[in-house]
Amino acid sequence: MSNQELKDNMHKSVEATQRNFATIRTGRANPSLLDRINVEYYGTETPLKSLATISTPDSQTIAIQPFDNGSMGLIEKAIATSDLGLTPNNDGKIIRINVPPLTEERRKEFCKLAARYAEEGKVALRNIRRDAIDKVKKLEKDAELSKDQSHDEQDGIQKLTDTFITEIEKYLAEKEADILKV
């Protein structure tokens, strides 16, 4: 695994963690809250964003305008049954969701969820590190690398891992501050 390949894989893990963070409510309306909502549409699980235009007319409202009015009830049901705790209001043309301010208890729950997503991201980074170090050790065993070269490579991999873990921790701190901000 080349150094660039290693960086790319680690960067993808950090991006996946950021996408997970984006799905956590912060008390303000944000279209990415609905990224994980799938709608049972003609017998197929379809992402909500491919069935409708999602916008935020103000900081407390999400507006959903389906491309096909026949899917309105399905979209409404998918949102209502999600774990987001949001209640959709259907006026026949647009589904509006009022995003209420978060309670203190809900804020703490979302902070725990963010911490869990961060830990999952760190575990993914550690798995990438383990695979890379295993490859370096194999090269050393096959006498393609000296002990010193192997040690230097492993140190470089560890430093890279530490850098990306610090990045995830920074994003976690930002997300927690965002969630706890009233």
UniProtKB/Swiss-Prot annotation:
GO CC list: cytoplasm
KW NADP (keyword) present: no
Biological source species: Prochlorococcus marinus (strain MIT 9313)
Keywords: Cytoplasm, Protein biosynthesis
Purpose of the protein: Responsible for the release of ribosomes from messenger RNA at the termination of protein biosynthesis. May increase the efficiency of translation by recycling ribosomes from one round of translation to another.
GO biological process: translational termination
Molecular function (Gene Ontology), one example: ribosomal large subunit binding
NCBIfam families: frr
Similarity section: Belongs to the RRF family.
CDD domains linked: RRF
Subcellular location(s) per record: Cytoplasm
Protein name: Ribosome-recycling factor
